[in-house]
Amino acid sequence: MFDVQREELMWGDRKLVLETGKVARQADGAVIATYGETSVLATVVAAKEPKPGIDFMPLTVNYQERAYAAGRIPGGYFKREGRPSEKETLVSRLIDRPIRPLFIEGWRNDTQVVVTVLTHDLENDPDIVAMVAASAALTLSGVPFMGPIGGARVGYINGGYRLNPLVTETKEESSLDLVVAGTQDAVLMVESEAKELSEDVMLGAVMFGHKHFQPVIEAIIRLAEKAAKEPRDFKAPENADVEKAVLEVCEAELRAAYTKTVKQERYAAVDAVKAKVMAALCPEGAEKFPAEKVKAAFKEAQSKVVRWNILDSGARIDGRDVKTVRSILSEVGVLPRAHGSALFTRGETQALVVATLGTGEDEQFIDALEGTYKERFLLHYNFPPYSVGETGRMGSPGRREIGHGKLAWRAIRPVLPPAHEFPYTIRVVSEITESNGSSSMASVCGGSLSLMDAGVPLRRPVAGIAMGLILEGERFAVLSDILGDEDHLGDMDFKVAGTDEGVTSLQMDIKIAGITEEIMKIALAQAKDGRAHILAEMAKALTAARPELGEYAPRIETMQIPTDKIRDVIGTGGKVIREIVEKTGAKINIEDTGVVKIASADGKAIKAAYNWIRSIVAEPEVGVIYDGTIVKCMEFGAFVNFFGAKDGLVHISELAAQRVAKVQDVVKEGDKVKVKFLGQDDRGKIRLSMKVVDQQTGEDITDKIKAQRDAERAERGDEPREPREGGRHRGERRREAGE
């Protein structure tokens, strides 16, 4: 029934298995990839006919995690998976980015890649396995895909690179989390987070990963030789004649349009040239070429004009040379009641970034295959249509917004203070108010400034820069701080963020082969210079975190209590902690380790809650006098609440210096008294005394009582002796004497 084909190899120190022919046989391509005990199913289906009226490649990648893969049942009311999580969206993009450039130009058939995590061993992250499985399924499917690709994760542990480190190693030991993908000849995609590593270490990791995923590519090729379907009958459309005709009509005017340095004016001029081309080559009723081909050829003409200008003269669209960064203006404290805010403007790209501080209650709960955990640092990126002068959809964030936000998150997270030093939940929101390239890097710069404005003690300021590359044969130009057009028309887009000490994040997308290690090295060095310039410009606004938190930010006081006292602070059914919160107005979070975080914008509320909790967990000191309240009178004495929630007994013999016949003759319930803590009896009960304390002044009069008794004994001719203590201990001494 099944024609199963398999390929196995040892990759790193674990086995990778690729299998096809048993599951999802009606798909154009289907592969189950297993690494360790993490298994992923990837399927590919492409429409039989091209989609009419489009000028882009209609590729969709859907990565989905199933709770059963980790032996879990989803939470929520419906107990089933819902909308894609942030990680699912990010991994979908991670797979899409290296495979999209490898489809033959002109492919317009709807193509869907669906990747499903079937099992997760909690050791091997499914994202790399998913990328390999998707590459294999595409290679088998017969669609015009010029792959396969391979992918790998690279860690940096104790000064050495580690291939596909385990999940725990990546989180706890590695100073680098880098994912690289590419073909046999070229690197196509890099995504990474690093702890201020050098450019040389980052580039070394890229090349290390490229070298070590070659066996995977070879295994996919061997599998394809046994199980691949016949290639689709598709050839890239020949547009040379159309492109030539378009250039003849518009080259001079297009070059002139691209000399306009203001984005809106340039776009208007380019649109006018396009309208002229369409009128000349596609007049109504007498089309010389199909309109779709003319539009595609015009885009190609735009690319050629921009690229020729840069390579021939070094002049860019806005008049800069290849290394110059656009003018920068940084402002902080721009919003009066925000905890921290910054407005970062770089040319025609602008980000209004706001930092907000919260407590442990504000941490985000992440429901992942590895289990539920809490995230204390959030960064959200919003890209409204008005930022590019357009109307458009408003609503929940799209894949691009999620991806850009995560890139900025990776750039800033390595310099945040640890939770035990700064116990706040931190949220940064970047509102892109203007955009003409590298808005994600503007979010990094603005995010760093807003956090410092809020008083968050970052290790060092972080800046980011977007770089581009134009490559024609042996000639190339590396572009610093690219515009939107340079991003679309160039051959490489890579973003580097970091401090003056090193790189914290690197994202790279390469659209063509032929980009060598040496070119990437030059590009990274140029990016380092650009980053240093941006950091210097940011320093004009703020060089380090403010010494105090923002006026409206909550203050958090941390205290450690014994774990066996946690239940005393919480109380039965939460009674005690609710009372503290209600009466002080502070927020209180108690961790299992005994760490208590008290938060409020009012310092008095924090102090009141702190003292209340301390009174509950602290132990009274022997010999110290405390204020108390009579809570109950008995025949043998009175119970006094004297130390927070603590009660102790004043024995009838300790109520007053003279003999007391009836407790109520001295005190009644509700009386405010002063008591001395005498210690605990053999049953752990607290013993208190009132008679040795002056109830008016609170003075300890033990010595006065002793002196008075000694004087009385002297008058009687008796030997002086120590004053006796009443209660249980007096009886114990009598019993001991009897023994």
Swiss-Prot record:
It catalyses: RNA(n+1) + phosphate = RNA(n) + a ribonucleoside 5'-diphosphate. GO terms for biological process: mRNA catabolic process; RNA processing. Its EC number is 2.7.7.8. The keyword Acyltransferase does not apply. It is found in: Cytoplasm. It comes from the Bacteria. One of its GO terms (cellular component) is cytosol. Keywords: Cytoplasm, Magnesium, Metal-binding, Nucleotidyltransferase, RNA-binding, Transferase. Mg(2+) binds at residues 487, 493. CDD domains: KH-I_PNPase, RNase_PH_PNPase_1, RNase_PH_PNPase_2, S1_PNPase. GO terms for molecular function: 3'-5'-RNA exonuclease activity; magnesium ion binding; polyribonucleotide nucleotidyltransferase activity; RNA binding. Residues 554-613 form the KH domain. PANTHER family: POLYRIBONUCLEOTIDE NUCLEOTIDYLTRANSFERASE, POLYRIBONUCLEOTIDE NUCLEOTIDYLTRANSFERASE 1, MITOCHONDRIAL. Involved in mRNA degradation. Catalyzes the phosphorolysis of single-stranded polyribonucleotides processively in the 3'- to 5'-direction. HAMAP family: PNPase. This is Polyribonucleotide nucleotidyltransferase. It comes from Methylobacterium radiotolerans (strain ATCC 27329 / DSM 1819 / JCM 2831 / NBRC 15690 / NCIMB 10815 / 0-1).
